[in-house]
Regions:
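Bacterial Sec-dependent N-terminal signal peptides
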Residues: 1-22
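Compositionally biased amphipathic helical and low-complexity segments enriched in hydrophobic
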Residues: 5, 26-29, 42, 108, ...
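A near-ubiquitous, low-amplitude feature marking generic local secondary-structure context
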Residues: 8, 24-27, 31, 35, ...
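A general, composition-driven signal for non-globular sequence regions
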Residues: 13-15, 31, 75
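Sec-dependent signal peptide cleavage junction
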Residues: 17-46, 50, 124
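Compact alpha-helical subdomains of small soluble proteins
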Residues: 55-124
C-alpha cells in the first residue's frame, strides 16, 4: 500500500509540476541540426544560438538555471544526445572525453548549462 501511495504521489507531482514548454531540438530545423556536427563546446553554443527561435531564447532567460536544466533534459537535451553525441560525431565525443566527461547525459548537461550561462551572461 505504501508503494502504491508513493507511486501515485510521484505521478501527481509529475503532472502538477512538470508543465514543460517544449524547446524541442527536432522542431527547430531538423535537417540543419542533423547536418551540423559541432566539434567542441563553443561550436555547440554557436549552433544552438543559431537554431533556437528568438521566443525560445527569451523564454529560457526567464528560467533559473535549475529550471532550464529540468525542462530541457528530455527535450533539447535528448536532441543533443541523439543528433550530436550518439549519431557518430567522434570529434565532439572526443572533446568531452578529453575533458573527463564520459557519459552522454553529462555531455549534454554541460552543453545545456553552458548555453544557459551564455544566454544569461552568468560567469561561474
Amino acid at each position: 500500500m505504501k508503494h502504491l501511495i508513493t507511486f501515485c504521489m510521484c505521478i501527481i507531482s509529475f503532472i502538477a509540476f512538470g508543465q514543460i514548454k517544449n524547446i524541442d531540438m527536432k522542431k527547430q530545423k531538423p535537417k540543419d541540426m542533423k547536418k551540423q556536427k559541432p566539434k567542441n563546446l563553443t561550436e555547440c553554443i554557436q549552433m544552438l544560438d543559431k537554431n533556437l527561435k528568438k521566443q525560445d531564447k527569451e523564454y529560457i532567460k526567464t528560467l533559473t538555471e535549475d529550471e532550464f536544466f529540468m525542462e530541457s533534459h528530455f527535450t533539447l537535451g535528448m536532441g543533443i544526445r541523439n543528433e550530436w553525441l550518439r549519431s557518430g560525431n567522434p570529434e565532439l565525443v572526443k572533446f568531452f572525453l578529453d575533458q573527463g566527461v564520459k557519459h552522454p547525459d553529462d555531455m549534454s548537461a554541460m552543453i545545456l548549462t553552458s548555453y544557459y550561462r551564455h544566454l544569461t551572461m552568468v560567469n561561474d
